[in-house]
């Protein structure tokens, strides 16, 4: 108790050395500080336990009883360990925290050893010989080392590891080669021959042996068949197999099933597994066979097509309007959206007898579609033929009127109050071979048979005429539509059946008859009254510009040398739609001349001045109908100070104002209508225009041989504001900017202008110079310096050969 620390340390070291010298356990003294007396006891207990274990090992090895030795060792080791651990724990002044892992390792190391493990194994062998159950050994893993006695790890040699791996690979390759040789050793090579092929005796022996084996096999088969027939086994087996064969699901049960794939997607010789398509539990319908891989492939192909598909606009695309049974199938308005709204229509076919499908029905349906399609299209066309100027007899049949319709028209004409019994015949213009012209308004036209018969009836049944009138304005009288309505009542069914052209023709014929009747009434006027009327017109013409608006002067024309000369100078022949219509007037003149000749030539000179006149006898076809305004070409100029109307009239006479001929509307008043001749011309042209528009779409029946070598070269060019021709890209950009209402930015515009300037410089440059004229500048510089070269860098003095610098 009263010893110093130095003395206490020497005592502990002596105790540790004594314990180690006695051959006791390798147990280290506790780390905590204990009393000197307890340490000696613990070391003494440890040494006594070691001696007991040594004696028990020797005793067990001598007697051969491992079990008793092991039990004694276990008891002695446990007893010594308890004593060694219990005694120091009773009296401890200061104790540190225990290390459980360290103590367990120390105890296991003390209790286990090579001799004990061998004795347990020998004990188990003896127990096995005696038929007893072997002892269970709880093997405790040895730790690699402790803190006081660490165990060094094995050194890893990479060269040894590599050699070991190479050796393993060589062994595996040798093993694989050996197995391959064993497998291929049974197969004969091409160079090896069977010994019995070359030796005749060996071949005969082998043949006899094979024959014997065949005979034995046949005998065994016959014997087995006889036994089966005797015991009835074969019949039972056949019945059993037949029943199983009938119960099995075979190809005959596949008849009528639908395969939801196109028949072209199955290739010949390829095996495809079809399964039933999934459907809802409550969904009714037949079973459908599908292949999962083909469904995925079709879906992938469709997705690829949808990705690269562009929106198409085909407003005139014609789909097949006939189904498989040659029936008209309904067409949807927007067929391209049917798949999105109603879903995709899958391709399918049905399996036939035996589960086979050859696509015969699909091919038959396709052949029917092809036949129907070919029937609708014919490649045979009518050969070219010469265009006839006149209608053929077959075409004239369509223009003939029935007798019933003719009688009705004649009856309506008889109901007219005023009839022309002195109507001039139009002449024998029709012949059997003349069937009318295709060019309406450009030649003679045939008078319909209805008109001829009506004219004959009117001549046979004359009516008293009203008293004649000497008013020249009757020529300008307009026949209203209400009077024409008397010929054909609007409510009659016959009028509804007639086409528009026939109704217009009948109206014009009726008006023509009445106008001719009024003109014939004018011929019966007294000549004195005509002279007075002419004198009145002359007096009114001399009064001045106020008499210009008199409608009575429209029917008179005055000819003199000056007016004829001015008329010839001012006439400009035009043949367009807005021209003079000289051809139409010539036709009307020709018809009027024939009417005069048929009437006996009783027309007077005064009648010629009413509406028709001949300027030159040599040119009978050049007639001009002048109004009253044409006679005042060289009259006295009106006084301008009378007002604005006088000034405008003066400007109009001098040609300073552009006058446009306006179409006069039809009114009820007789003094506001057009002349009869002009009125008839306009109506005839309206009818002709209607038929000509219809003939525009008939096309030509013969090619223009004069235009065989004509190959038009059409070039569409665009220019900018400066007159420069634009490229297709620039033209498109200009149209796009004009359409969208926005142009390029500032930078793009500047770059484009710079590029245009460079192109202009390239066009202006000389063939021996650059666009900027550098060659010309170089020559000018050389000429100024009088040197055959030019200095690009440095000063001229440094490059001078006469100057020497150091």
UniProtKB/Swiss-Prot annotation:
There is a cross-link at residues 125, 133, 141, 147, 188, 277, 329, 336, 400, 414, 554, 654, 663, 690, 705, 715, 729, 755, 764, 781, 786, 797 (Glycyl lysine isopeptide (Lys-Gly) (interchain with G-Cter in SUMO2)). Keywords: Coiled coil, Isopeptide bond, mRNA processing, mRNA splicing, Nucleus, Phosphoprotein, Spliceosome, Ubl conjugation. The modification Phosphothreonine is found at residues 189, 430, 701, 770. It comes from the Eukaryota. One of its GO terms (biological process) is positive regulation of cytotoxic T cell differentiation. It is found in: Nucleus. The keyword Transmembrane helix does not apply. Residues 1-121, 418-504, 578-610 are annotated as: Disordered. Sumoylated with SUMO2. GO terms for cellular component: Cajal body; catalytic step 2 spliceosome; Golgi apparatus; nuclear speck; U2-type precatalytic spliceosome; U4/U6 x U5 tri-snRNP complex. Its main location: nucleus. InterPro entries: HIND, SNU66/SART1. There is a cross-link at residue 141 (Glycyl lysine isopeptide (Lys-Gly) (interchain with G-Cter in SUMO1)). The modification Phosphoserine is found at residues 321, 348, 480, 492, 527, 597, 602, 604, 627, 767, 795. Residues 58-101 have a biased composition (Basic and acidic residues). Residues 104-119 have a biased composition (Low complexity). Ubiquitously expressed. Shows a high expression in fetal liver and a low expression in adult liver. Belongs to the SNU66/SART1 family. Plays a role in mRNA splicing as a component of the U4/U6-U5 tri-snRNP, one of the building blocks of the spliceosome. May also bind to DNA. PANTHER family: SQUAMOUS CELL CARCINOMA ANTIGEN RECOGNISED BY CYTOTOXIC T LYMPHOCYTES (PTHR14152), U4_U6.U5 TRI-SNRNP-ASSOCIATED PROTEIN 1 (PTHR14152:SF5). This is U4/U6.U5 tri-snRNP-associated protein 1. It comes from Mus musculus. The gene is Sart1.
């Amino acid at each position: 108790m009263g010893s110093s620390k130095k003395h206490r340390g020497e005592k502990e070291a002596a105790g540790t050395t004594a314990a180690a010298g006695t051959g006791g356990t390798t147990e280290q003294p506790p780390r905590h500080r204990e009393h000197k007396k307890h340490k000696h006891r613990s070391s003494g207990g440890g040494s006594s336990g070691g001696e007991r274990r040594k004696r028990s090992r020797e005793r067990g090895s001598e007697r051969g009883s491992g079990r008793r030795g092991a039990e004694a060792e276990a008891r002695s080791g446990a007893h010594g360990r308890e004593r060694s651990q219990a005694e120091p724990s009773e009296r401890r002044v200061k104790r540190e925290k225990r290390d459980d892992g360290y103590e367990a390792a120390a105890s296991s190391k003390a209790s286990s050893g090579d001799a004990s493990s061998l004795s347990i194994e020998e004990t188990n062998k003896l127990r096995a010989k005696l038929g007893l159950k072997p002892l269970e050994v709880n093997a405790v893993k040895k730790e690699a080392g402790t803190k006081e006695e660490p165990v060094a790890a094995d050194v890893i040699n990479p060269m040894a590891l590599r050699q070991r791996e190479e050796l393993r690979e060589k062994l595996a390759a040798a093993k694989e080669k050996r197995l391959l040789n064993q497998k291929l050793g049974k197969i004969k090579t091409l160079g090896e021959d069977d010994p019995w092929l070359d030796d005749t005796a060996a071949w005969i022996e082998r043949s006899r042996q094979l024959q014997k084996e065949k005979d034995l096999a046949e005998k065994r088969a016959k014997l087995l068949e006889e036994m089966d027939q005797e015991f009835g086994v074969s019949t039972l087996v056949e019945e059993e197999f037949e029943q199983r064969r009938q119960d099995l699901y075979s190809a005959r049960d596949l008849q009528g099933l639908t395969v939801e794939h196109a028949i072209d997607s199955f290739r010949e010789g390829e095996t495809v597994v079809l399964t039933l398509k999934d459907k809802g539990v409550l969904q009714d319908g037949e079973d459908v066979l599908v292949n999962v891989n083909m469904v995925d492939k079709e879906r992938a192909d469709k997705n690829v097509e949808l990705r690269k598909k562009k929106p198409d606009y085909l407003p005139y695309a014609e789909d097949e309007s006939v189904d498989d049974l040659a029936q008209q199938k309904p067409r949807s308005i927007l067929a391209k959206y049917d798949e999105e709204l109603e879903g995709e229509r899958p391709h399918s076919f049905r399996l036939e007898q035996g589960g086979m499908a050859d696509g015969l029905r699909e091919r038959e349906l396709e052949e029917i579609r092809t036949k129907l399609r070919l029937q609708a299209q014919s490649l045979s066309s009518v050969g070219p033929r010469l265009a006839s100027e006149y209608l053929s007899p077959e075409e004239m049949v369509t223009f003939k009127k029935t007798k019933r319709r003719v009688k009705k028209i004649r009856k309506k004409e008889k109901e007219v109050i005023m009839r022309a019994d002195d109507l001039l015949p139009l002449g024998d213009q029709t012949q059997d071979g003349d069937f009318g012209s295709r060019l309406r308004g450009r030649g003679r036209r045939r008078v319909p048979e209805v008109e001829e018969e009506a004219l004959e009836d009117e001549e046979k049944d004359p009516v008293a005429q009203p008293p004649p009138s000497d008013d020249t304005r009757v020529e300008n009288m307009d026949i209203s539509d209400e009077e024409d309505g008397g010929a054909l009542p609007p409510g009659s069914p016959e009028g509804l059946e007639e086409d528009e052209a026939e109704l217009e023709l009948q109206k014009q014929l009726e008006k023509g008859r009445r106008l001719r009747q009024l003109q014939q009434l004018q011929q019966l006027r007294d000549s004195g009254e005509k002279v007075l009327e002419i004198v009145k017109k002359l007096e009114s013409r001399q009064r001045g510009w106020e008499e210009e608006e008199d409608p009575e002067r429209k029917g008179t024309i005055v000819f003199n040398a000056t007016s004829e000369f001015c008329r010839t100078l001012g006439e400009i022949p035009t043949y367009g739609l807005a021209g003079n219509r000289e051809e139409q007037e010539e036709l009307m003149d020709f018809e009027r001349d024939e009417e005069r000749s048929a009437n006996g030539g009783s027309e007077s000179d005064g009648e010629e001045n009413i509406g028709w006149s001949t300027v030159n006898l040599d040119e009978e076809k050049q007639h001009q109908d002048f109004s009253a305004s044409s006679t005042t070409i060289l009259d006295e100029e009106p006084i301008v100070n009378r007002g604005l109307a006088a000034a405008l009239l003066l400007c109009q006479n001098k040609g300073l104002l552009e006058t446009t001929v306006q179409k006069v509307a039809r009114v009820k008043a007789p003094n506001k209508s057009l002349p009869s001749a002009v009125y008839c011309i306009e109506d005839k042209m309206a009818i002709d225009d209607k038929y000509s528009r219809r003939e525009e779409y008939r096309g030509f029946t013969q090619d223009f041989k004069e235009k065989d070598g004509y190959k038009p070269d059409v070039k569409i060019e665009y220019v900018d504001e400066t007159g420069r021709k634009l490229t297709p890209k620039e033209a498109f950009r200009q149209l796009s900017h004009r359409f969208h209402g926005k142009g390029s930015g500032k930078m793009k515009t500047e770059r484009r202008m710079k590029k245009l300037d460079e192109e202009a410089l390239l066009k202006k440059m000389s063939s021996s110079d650059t666009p900027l004229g550098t060659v010309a500048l170089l020559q000018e510089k050389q000429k100024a310096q009088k040197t055959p070269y030019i200095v690009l860098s440095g000063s001229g003095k440094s490059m001078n050969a006469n100057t020497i610098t150091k």
